Design a protein with these regions (language model features):
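An alpha-helical, amphipathic repeat domain used for nucleic-acid recognition
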Residues: 1-98
C-alpha cells in the first residue's frame, strides 16, 4: 500500500499522469483494486482538476498546427496517452481549440 501511494503521488505530480494511466500501471504491477483505490484517494479532486486545467492551457499553446482538426487530434492524443479521462479531454479540446 505504501508503494502504491508513493507511486501515485510521484507519477501524478512529476509525470502528470491521469487516474486511468495510474490505475493501469498499478494493475500491471499486480496491485489489488482496493489498494489502487486507496492510493488514488490521495489525489485531491480540486488539485487534480487544477493541474489538468493548467496542463491543457499550456499544451494548447505549445502545439503548432494550422489545421484545427489535426491540432485537436494531437491535443487529445497527448492527454489520453497520459491517462486523463476522455470526457475531460474532449470537453477541454473543443473548448480551447477552435
Amino acid at each position: 500500500a505504501r508503494f502504491a501511494k508513493a507511486f501515485v503521488r510521484g507519477k501524478f505530480r512529476i509525470k502528470h499522469w491521469g487516474r486511468r494511466r495510474l490505475t493501469l500501471e498499478l494493475k500491471r504491477k499486480d496491485i489489488s483494486k482496493l489498494v489502487i483505490n486507496q492510493a488514488l484517494a490521495e489525489i485531491d479532486d480540486e488539485e487534480y482538476m487544477q493541474l489538468f486545467s493548467d496542463l491543457t492551457e499550456k499544451r494548447a499553446n505549445i502545439i503548432k498546427e494550422s489545421n484545427v482538426f489535426k491540432k485537436r487530434k494531437k491535443f487529445i492524443d497527448y492527454f489520453l496517452y497520459r491517462g486523463w479521462e476522455s470526457h475531460l479531454v474532449y470537453e477541454k479540446a473543443y473548448e480551447l481549440i477552435k
